[in-house]
Amino acid sequence: ADYGYNISMGDHCFCNYGCVLLDVCPIRIGDMTQIGPYVQILTADHPRDAATRDQGREFGQPVEIGRNVWIGGGAILLPGVTVGDDAVIGAGAVVTKPVAAGMTVAGNPARPLVPRASSH
């Protein structure tokens, strides 16, 4: 973790080796979530406009991950995304938009594949 004090992990979570949690804003991870190796969860961002970026401005957006989420190795979650409960993020996916509960996403940018069957 870069800072560490903005990270909140639920009960029975697992975070594999080599992960980066850049927490300039809050990162919230729900219970029973599993995070594969080399996953990056990023909250630091910068303006897209070159003139504003030249002024040195930066900002952050929080990332929220629900409960019982599985994040495959090497996935990248960009600032401001939310991931719903029981979702699956495929290995190497780049998550740029919200992921609905129960959804499986993969690719760059991450796109929906199929909803997972509920185990409840």
Where are these regions (language model features)?
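Flexible, glycine/small-residue-enriched loop-and-beta-strand segment within the central core
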Residues: 1-82, 103, 108-120
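C-terminal/domain-terminus segments
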Residues: 83-98, 104
